[in-house]
Amino acid sequence: LKELKSLDLLKKEEKQIMVVPYGDRSGVVIEPWLTDQWFCDAKKLSIDPIKSVKNEKTKFVPKQWEKTFFNWMDNIQPWCISRQLWWGHQIPAWYGPDRKIFVALNEKAAIIKAKKFYKKNVKLIRDPDVLDTWFSSGLWPFATLGWPKKNYFLNKFYPTSVLVTGFDIIFFWVARMAMFGMEFLNKEPFKDIYVHALVRDEKGQKMSKSKGNVIDPLKLIEKHSADALRFTLLSMASPGRDVKLSEERVKGYRNFLNKLRNANNFLKMNKCDFKKTSKIPKISININKWIYAEFIETKNIVEKNIKDYRFDEA
């Protein structure tokens, strides 16, 4: 304030009530601190992914999540990609004696650039910051396949067919993968984006360690079986609705599966033939014809629902 007054730049001074932010984990006051950071021109990178979704080259399932995607992408701001952390992909930038920046693939390449600029050998200091984790994650669809080298795996598996993800990271992860895929390979990284529900506790609250409401799936599997948990989650996987998971629901589907298992055991006891065959059986008894027709109709409905990502209906 004294400096502003001395420069005659202070217009007004008054008391204000402020909301003081505290860290979730540390519990201490968060103080804003201006520092130099690296930024990415996200607006430029967002153009092609937006076109891809609008032209239906990339589809969201359910379609309603397109609105969330467009809302983020149409209002995107410069992306701060540097982080002051101990672990991560270190930013490939080195500083000369006068803070001149040299960006290179490795230190050897940076030294060559610096020598060319200064006309002599100089000591370089590497930027200590690392990349934002979502920057690294955005490279996942092709970095895992050997990129930047062109090889069999990259040609065969990029782009992929389906990405399965939660709605809470559409912007943080999905959008970044789309931006990098279009920028570096000129192809959408995936054709369909299936946005599944969040699994919450029985009261609809988001699970967190701090709340103490985390349901351990391994304990549910140990107690009620993996099939019971799978059946529960699939039956509740209605598009656009979160899952309110409780042990009672898992127990109920376990009991239902027990009935199916008992029916199967009954057929085995009566020496029913379960040999796999592609041949259509010859059926003469009317009731068996009806059973077979119902089976084929059910099979077709299940296959269509799975293709349409309606796992709850399947």
What are these regions (language model features)?
Residues 45, 154, 184, 243-245, ...:
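A generic membrane alpha-helix/interface feature
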Residues 84-88, 92-241:
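Alpha-helical recognition segments enriched in aromatics with Gly/Pro capping
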Residues 61-62, 159, 281, 285:
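Generic structural signal for alpha-helix starts
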Residues 1-98, 205, 211-256, 261, ...:
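Residue patterns forming the tRNA-binding/recognition surfaces of aminoacyl-tRNA synthetases
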Residues 89, 187-193, 268-282:
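Short, glycine/acidic-rich hinge or "gate" loops at secondary-structure transitions
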Residues 172, 188, 251, 309-314:
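Short, solvent-exposed positions on alpha-helices
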